[in-house]
Amino acid sequence: MKKSVNLLSGGTDSATVLAIASEMCYEIYAMSFNYGQRNNAELRKVKELIKKYNVKQHKIVDIDLRAFGGSALTDDNIDVPYYHGINALPEIVPVTYVPARNTIFLSYAVGFAEVIGSQDIFIGVHTSDSANYPDCCPEYIQSFEKMVNLATNMGVQGKKITIHAPLIDMTKEQIIRTGLKLGVDYKNTISCYSPTEDDLSCGNCLACIIRLDAFKKNNIQDPIKYV
């Protein structure tokens, strides 16, 4: 059985990708990050996901991205912005962008993949996020994969490492629809940038608004609780 390394945040995208990798019959090794994020609730949500999909091993890696901040998710001096509906969302990179986050996460995933002998890494990025988050575009994934195969022992030995981004051309609406078809229980996910201490989502941050809109377009109620 082929092994995969899945980046798992506890949000809707990574949960859907986990289901896709499971459907493809990979032996799954999941990797999550405790990087000083406000939305630490996501790390509690992944527990149910790893049980459902029989994850072989789950690594939670501690990284202190608060050391340099620069994002509303890692710096208490920067407020998480709230919006009034889907049409009010910004078309520029917002303050919730975490500098180089996907590059950092993928680098750890590559290291883990080399150790366990996996040539397949899965990440839940998609182009519909790329206007706000530049490390979610196809060109980024392609360039990172090329770099990895130039700069790793596996790569130079001809054991090509592939960065799988199965959601890359999907909208959030399509991602939720795909996950529902695969039986993803979105009750065990959280997207909010600033949830309460008892894991209630705010409903007004960029992530919550996009999530709620996607469920609405699928004519289904979001199963998580909001303030």
From Swiss-Prot:
* Co-factor(s): Zn(2+)
Organism domain of life: Bacteria
Which EC numbers does the record give?
6.3.4.20
- What catalytic reaction does the record list? 7-carboxy-7-deazaguanine + NH4(+) + ATP = 7-cyano-7-deazaguanine + ADP + phosphate + H2O + H(+)
Annotated ATP binding sites: 8-18
Q: Signal sequence span per UniProt?
A: none
Tell me which residues bind Zn(2+).
Answer: 192, 202, 205, 208
List the Gene Ontology MF annotations in alphabetical order: ATP binding; ligase activity, forming carbon-nitrogen bonds; zinc ion binding
Q: In which pathway does it act?
A: Purine metabolism; 7-cyano-7-deazaguanine biosynthesis
Major enzyme class:
ligase
User: Mind listing the UniProt keywords for this protein, alphabetically?
Assistant: ATP-binding, Ligase, Metal-binding, Nucleotide-binding, Queuosine biosynthesis, Zinc
GO:BP terms for this protein?
Answer: queuosine biosynthetic process
Per the entry, what this protein does is: Catalyzes the ATP-dependent conversion of 7-carboxy-7-deazaguanine (CDG) to 7-cyano-7-deazaguanine (preQ(0)).
Protein name according to UniProt: 7-cyano-7-deazaguanine synthase
**Source species of the chain:** Rickettsia prowazekii (strain Madrid E)
Gene name, per UniProt, is: queC
